[in-house]
């Protein structure tokens, strides 16, 4: 991290906006931050849905401890913002006994919901 009074230069910055609503931008700073994104306009699949943007991008930076971080993401109207990165926490593995129970339950036929 730079001291608060130090100016960080922009090494490169590009932006393209197209008449169809699509776009692309990227930048890189003097302290190693990089980011990019591409957006595409999509038509809704139903008549009552409007158009929406699907965005894909990434950013990377070096943390205060010197660790390099990188995040890739996609954002749309169905799933929202979905980031991925090797440094994100992951859930612990399912214990074997629970996994066996889940596997067994998956083999059973479904039963209808009881009516009130």
From Swiss-Prot:
The keyword Plastid does not apply. Keywords: Amidation, Cuticle, Glycoprotein, Pyrrolidone carboxylic acid. InterPro entries: CHIT_BIND_RR_consensus, Cuticle_Struct_Prot, Insect_cuticle. One of its GO terms (cellular component) is chitin-based extracellular matrix. Residues 20-92 form the Chitin-binding type R&R domain. PANTHER family: CUTICLE PROTEIN (PTHR10380), CUTICULAR PROTEIN 47EG-RELATED (PTHR10380:SF241). This is Endocuticle structural glycoprotein SgAbd-4. It comes from Schistocerca gregaria.
């Amino acid at each position: 991290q730079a001291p608060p009074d130090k100016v960080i230069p922009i090494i490169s910055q590009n932006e393209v906006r197209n008449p169809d609503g699509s776009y692309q931008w990227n930048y890189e700073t003097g302290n190693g931050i990089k980011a990019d994104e591409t957006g595409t306009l999509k038509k809704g699949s139903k008549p009552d849905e409007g158009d929406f943007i699907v965005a894909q991008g990434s950013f990377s930076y070096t943390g205060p401890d010197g660790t390099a971080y990188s995040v890739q993401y996609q954002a749309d109207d169905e799933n929202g913002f979905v980031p991925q990165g090797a440094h994100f926490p992951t859930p612990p593995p399912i214990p074997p006994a629970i996994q066996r129970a889940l596997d067994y339950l998956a083999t059973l036929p479904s039963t209808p919901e009881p009516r009130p």
